């Protein structure tokens, strides 16, 4: 799905309280993101940039109907990091980053076991964890491998087109993939998302 907004800006803010925020058409970043060419030798923040850019589709064009479904936004933005790396640096680099994401999730899973989509939480901040980000991105990759690239990306396009400018829940994503593949995917979504 093409970018629908008239522009896109990235704004660096001093003393910003968060890493980044994906406002529609203008992502706010902390000043850590502003780097000189020599800084890039040590570390770059392409993952943050690609993550926030993917939110223009997954979070802004289509958003969630509740905090319980926030993994729809964050899982896709995290998987966007993988897709960017795969495009720019190749599959090996992307797979290495995916392995890092998996380990990040597994570290958290050592003391916290919850479903990706969960309706019982103390505060909405509880939803912004490695389950929603790292595990969600890995589950999307697993779904891509199961369906194949053609069906996976056709399903994403259908999901975005059918739901643009609206709020959704996880079942909307499942229905888009089912419409494209003709396959009942309840088993996959029930096992990995709920």
Identify the meaning behind each predicted range.
Residues 1-194:
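Hydrophobic alpha-helical and helix-loop surface patches within well-folded domains
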């Amino acid at each position: 799905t093409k970018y629908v907004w008239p522009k896109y800006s990235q704004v660096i803010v001093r003393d910003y309280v968060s890493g980044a925020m994906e406002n529609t058409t203008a992502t706010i970043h902390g000043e850590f993101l502003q780097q000189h060419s020599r800084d890039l030798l040590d570390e770059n923040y392409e993952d943050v940039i690609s993550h926030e850019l993917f939110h223009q589709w997954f979070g802004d064009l289509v958003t969630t109907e509740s905090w319980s479904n926030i993994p729809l936004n964050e899982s896709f933005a995290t998987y966007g990091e993988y897709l960017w790396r795969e495009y720019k640096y190749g599959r090996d680099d992307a797979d290495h980053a995916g392995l890092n994401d998996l380990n990040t999730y597994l570290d958290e899973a050592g003391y916290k076991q919850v479903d990706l989509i969960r309706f019982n939480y103390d505060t909405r901040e509880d939803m912004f964890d490695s389950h929603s980000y790292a595990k969600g991105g890995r589950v999307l990759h697993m779904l891509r491998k199961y369906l194949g690239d053609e069906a996976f990306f056709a399903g994403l396009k259908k999901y975005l087109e059918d739901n643009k400018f609206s709020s959704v829940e996880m079942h909307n994503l499942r229905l888009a993939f089912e419409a494209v593949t003709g396959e009942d995917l309840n088993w996959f979504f029930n096992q990995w998302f709920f």
